[in-house]
Amino acid sequence: MSAGDAVCTGWLVKSPPERKLQRYAWRKRWFVLRRGRMSGNPDVLEYYRNKHSSKPIRVIDLSECAVWKHVGPSFVRKEFQNNFVFIVKTTSRTFYLVAKTEQEMQVWVHSISQVCNLGHLEDGADSMESLSYTPSSLQPSSASSLLTAHAASSSLPRDDPNTNAVATEETRSESELLFLPDYLVLSNCETGRLHHTSLPTRCDSWSNSDRSLEQASFDDVFVDCLQPLPSSHLVHPSCHGSGAQEVPSSRPQAALIWSREINGPPRDHLSSSPLLESSLSSTIQVDKNQGSLPCGAKELDIMSNTPPPRPPKPSHLSERRQEEWSTHSGSKKPECTLVPRRISLSGLDNMRTWKADVEGQSLRHRDKRLSLNLPCRFSPMYPTASASIEDSYVPMSPQAGASGLGPHCSPDDYIPMNSGSISSPLPELPANLEPPPVNRDLKPQRKSRPPPLDLRNLSIIREHASLTRTRTVPCSRTSFLSPERNGINSARFFANPVSREDEESYIEMEEHRTASSLSSGALTWTKKFSLDYLALDFNSASPAPMQQKLLLSEEQRVDYVQVDEQKTQALQSTKQEWTDERQSKV
């Protein structure tokens, strides 16, 4: 905002939020009151950290605010109890501001209140102007509508009491409707009570302002708003002698009824508007049987006791409707007129249902009657108030179906839902009829099971023992060992029976080494073939190599070990010394 928008500036002490009045500090800030009405901006109260700050700490919107001096209990801090405190309350927060002097406080209060009140006045003027700026074809100004109604009422003959009462009601209701002081014409206002015998009964949910709009619209004001309505929404008087009594219709809010003759002298003021005459004449329909009904009888009661008529042929539906409209509008005098009302928010819910029926009536009747072949409500035999009854009404009892079907009806035009009245056109099937046989082999995607395998001609597989390679010593043990060594080995063999297999392997290697030292030329093959391999066993049925070793005899079993001579000699000497020590202790 520019500096020219500033109305008042100065230092004020600002309060913290209301929940923190006693705990938090009150800060001194530089306040600027700006009025942005001339530039199109809202009225705000800004406060800065100091006088030279460019960005405000907070902007307080004064569109909905109130300002007053603080008078009452001293709930502010002690250091500000004797100061001049005023309150600015907005929709979001309440600000307690402390001024230095009383004059400064008066200036701030006056400036803020002037900005707030002026803003409210301008907002109200803008809202009123937005209402009066609507197109004149839809909503003319209130003064012009009032003058038009007054001129129309003055042009009417004075000998008609109903017309005078209508004009009086229009003038009085217009004065109730106009709430703007600039557009209220007091010279045309009249006071008094409404005579209920002059106008027909209306729905209580409509307000007086709504009624004044509809009555003013009759006098050539809302001419372009008139549109022909279907005959199902007309309400006819039940007795010719009384104009105030009328038969209740399905939607009384959809039309405004004027119970007076249209072709008489009161029609003089409508002669200047051919559009209005054509609109009114197109919406007139008088029922032929309506005059024969007793006073107070309701059309809904008659329809509830009478079955629906036979519907016309689908091809002649549109022709019969046109003939019916032309016959009713041209042959008889109209007894009542239909003026569509201008619906406000109070009657918006009722207007939605009425508008949906007006727009989709032709499509709904054509589709439903052609598809369901149900009775149509455009028959001249019954009143048009049958619109309140369900479209798809069908008698569910045999009596109603029989009475609805006269001698002139054919069963192809109207078929009731009762199966007992009309036999089925389909021929009956014999009781002993069986379905045709089905070839099970022709089913698609049927897979046959493969034949089982024949294992009778196969020969029996015999399991062979695995081939093992054994090695025997060509000479006996005792031929190379002295009697002393033999005794020592036998004693060691029986002393440690747990490690018998290990002992045996080392004894055997020792014998080989002794034999090689005695006759190196004869037994050179022992060193060359010191490592041997077992044959691979591919037969799973044969016993495992470990199990086969256990089954062999002790002399045939050979352990294949690659021996380190130095380690073996050291181990043998250690075992020898250990055995000697144990024997000496015994």
UniProtKB/Swiss-Prot annotation:
Residues 316-326 have a biased composition (Basic and acidic residues). The keyword Phosphoprotein applies. SUPFAM superfamilies: PH domain-like. Residues 149-171, 281-335, 401-453 are annotated as: Disordered. Keywords: Phosphoprotein. Phosphorylated on tyrosine residue(s) after macrophage colony-stimulating factor (M-CSF) receptor stimulation. Pfam families: PH. Gene3D superfamilies: Pleckstrin-homology domain (PH domain)/Phosphotyrosine-binding domain (PTB). One of its GO terms (biological process) is macrophage differentiation. Residues 5-117 form the PH domain. GO terms for molecular function: signaling adaptor activity. GO terms for cellular component: cytoplasm. The keyword DNA-binding does not apply. The modification Phosphoserine is found at residues 344, 482. Residues 283-292 have a biased composition (Polar residues). Coiled coil: none annotated. Interacts with PIK3R/p85, SHP2 and GRAP2/MONA. May interact with Grb2. Belongs to the GAB family. PANTHER family: GRB2-ASSOCIATED-BINDING PROTEIN, GRB2-ASSOCIATED-BINDING PROTEIN 3. This is GRB2-associated-binding protein 3. It comes from Homo sapiens (Human).
